[in-house]
Amino acid sequence: MSSRLTKKSYIIYGLGVSYFMIDQIYNQWLSYYYLPPETEKNLVPLLKPQYLVLAFIFARIIDAISDPVVGFLSDNSKSRFGRRSIFMLAGGLPLGILTIMYFYPIKSSQMATLIYLSVVGGLYFTAYTLVAAPYNALIPDLASTKEERLNLSTMQSTFRLIFTGVAMVLPGILISKL
């Protein structure tokens, strides 16, 4: 590792990818929660499959719009807190709250649940983009050499793998306790 970035810097940067754990919870557990398998007798489907797909499509359209907007704003920011940090700070808390909101839907009707999931999903992906896009753009900002970029990327990948494992196991344990 280079002398400019310390081992501690690499580890702290790698830990920053913890936001990815939230995305894995979304990817692996949200469909299960809203549309559990028929073998799960104590879990009731919250949405018809076609409504779940519509909510996911709406959320991803919002994601496709927010990605380049946040990227442009982050690249051109002149914030005194750093051009990337302000976005990550702005998105972090909403991302956590919106993740929790996914699992507390309005259950009055299929349409209400569809609208709720669509709105929460669109906001979730906007908050996710506020955290993830600037974080991933930090590598060229932090590293001055090819070796540093490679080391930062390796740390990010290592922690991403660890956080994926946590996201695969922990929610299953929590769901089984419900």
Residue ranges and their predicted role:
Residues 1-178:
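Membrane-embedded alpha-helical bundles of multi-pass transporters/translocases
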